[in-house]
């Protein structure tokens, strides 16, 4: 009896499957999918993948005025083997400062009310990737290129306090 019930349900299931197959035979007109991609074979190489910028020692005067620059330091990202590359676009990413989101936050546990500001050699500010700024574009002309920047520590809160003022900023470069 169980065998007959299983056999009948198996036949019923096969009938439903067969009906489903017959119902799907008219698929309509065929379509095309076009794929496109640009594959680059070369990008510049960086002289150093990690940079250390020693900002020295600075003194925080009280009362602290917002906008006061405490320390400035030039630094350069050196690119080599750039043949065939015409443009580099640099994005910098790190947590933005809570008092001024156009600047980079310092690591927790140290100085407060101070943020890191980065500008290119023309004075264009490099804003953290998640903020309202745009990446900075650099023209590449030749085998090597130097991307000149200036870092500065800036007071962003009148209640600024002293302490270690380290910041880690990740950067990425896109080439064209």
Swiss-Prot record:
Location of the protein in the cell: Fimbrium
Matching SUPFAM superfamilies: Bacterial adhesins (SSF49401)
Signal peptide: 1-23
Role, per record: Part of the lpfABCC'DE fimbrial operon. LP fimbriae may participate in the interaction with eukaryotic cells by assisting in microcolony formation.
Induction info: Induced during the exponential growth phase.
Keywords: Fimbrium, Signal
Name of protein: Probable fimbrial subunit LpfE
GO cellular component: pilus
GO BP terms: cell adhesion involved in single-species biofilm formation
Keyword Phosphoprotein: no
Family recorded in the similarity comment: Belongs to the fimbrial protein family.
Organism: Escherichia coli O157:H7
Entries under InterPro entries matching the protein: Adhesion_dom_fimbrial, Adhesion_dom_fimbrial_sf, Adhesion_dom_sf, Bact_Fimbrial_Adh_Pro
Gene3D superfamilies reported for this sequence: Fimbrial-type adhesion domain
